[in-house]
Amino acid sequence: MRIVFMGTPGFAEVILRALVGDKDIEVVGLFTQMDKPFGRKKELKAPETKTYILENHLNIPIFQPQSLKEPEVQILKDLKPNFIVVVAYGKILPKEVLTIAPCINLHASLLPKYRGASPIHEMILNDNKIYGISTMLMDVELDSGDILESASFLREDYLDLDALSLKLAHMGAALLLSTLKNFSSITRKSQDHMQASFCKKITKSDGLVGFKDAKSLFLKSLAFKSWPEIFLENGLKLLEVELVENEKSHKEGEILEIDEKGVLVGCLKGSVRIARLQAVGKKPLKAKDYLNGKRLKIGGILA
C-alpha cells in the first residue's frame, strides 16, 4: 500500500512513525510545511515529521511546497499513492489533489465537533469528559467529509495539551491503520452539519487571563501549556497552576496563602494554587520567592 503522508508537528510525527513501522505500508513521500524561524535567534527549525525522516535516514522524499498547485499536483500523481493521509498538515487540499487518490484525514476530535485548527485545545477548554479522534474522507470543505471511523476514551484525570496530544496521537495511529486496511469495507457516515462546531487557530492573546473564574483559568493553563502559556496584563506568566476549589468568592487576585507549594490566589469564583511565576524577560521563580521580591503578602493582590 503506497501512502503519501502530509503532516507537520509532533502529533503528526507519531502517526508517521506508525505508518513507517507497518510492513503492509510504504510511505512514498512526505509533504510538510516549510522550515520556520524559531527562538530569539530566529534560526530555521524543521517540522518534526521532516526531522524524523532525516534523523533516521529513511529513504522517503520530502516536499515542502508553498502551495499545492502545479508542479506539486503532477509530483503527487507521479508518486502513484493508493491513499493520501493528512494529519495536521496546515494547508487545505485543492480539488486537484483530492481526485488523485482517496484523501484520509485524521482529525483530533469526534466530528462534527471542533472542526478547524485547534480541536485538542477546545476539548480541554470546554472541560469535555470524553476525548476522541476521527478518520474522515476529505472533501473540498473544511473537516466536513464523511466519517470513516472514530475512537474515544473517558477522561479519568485532567491532561495538559502535551499529554492529551500524545495519547490521542497513539490512539489515532491505531485508528488510521485500521481505516487504511479496512477502507473498502467501511461504511461511511455523513456528518450532521447542524451539530458542527468550529475552532480557530490559537494566538498569543489567547493566553491572557485574569482572576475571575478559577476553573476557566486552570483549563487555560492546561490547554496553553506549551504556547502561548497563560499570563496577566503585565505579562507575568502563571506556571504550574492547580485548581483548589471553584465555589467560594474572593477578590480578584487576592493572595490567600503562601507556602513552599506556591501561592493560593482567589478569584471571583474559586481559587488556584500557582507554583511558579515568571516576569517578562526573567527566569521562572518559585511563587514564594517572587512574592518576597515584590514584598507581596497575604491579603495583597497579585496583578
Curated annotation (Swiss-Prot):
PANTHER family: METHIONYL-TRNA FORMYLTRANSFERASE (PTHR11138), METHIONYL-TRNA FORMYLTRANSFERASE, MITOCHONDRIAL (PTHR11138:SF5). Belongs to the Fmt family. Its EC number is 2.1.2.9. Attaches a formyl group to the free amino group of methionyl-tRNA(fMet). The formyl group appears to play a dual role in the initiator identity of N-formylmethionyl-tRNA by promoting its recognition by IF2 and preventing the misappropriation of this tRNA by the elongation apparatus. It is an enzyme of class 2 (transferase). Gene3D superfamilies: 3.40.50.12230. Keywords: Protein biosynthesis, Transferase. The gene is fmt. One of its GO terms (molecular function) is methionyl-tRNA formyltransferase activity. It holds the Pfam family Formyl_trans_C. The keyword rRNA-binding does not apply. It comes from the Bacteria. The keyword Chloroplast does not apply. NCBIfam families: fmt. One of its GO terms (cellular component) is cytosol. This is Methionyl-tRNA formyltransferase. The lineage of its organism: Bacteria, Pseudomonadati, Campylobacterota, Epsilonproteobacteria, Campylobacterales. HAMAP family: Formyl_trans. GO terms for biological process: conversion of methionyl-tRNA to N-formyl-methionyl-tRNA.
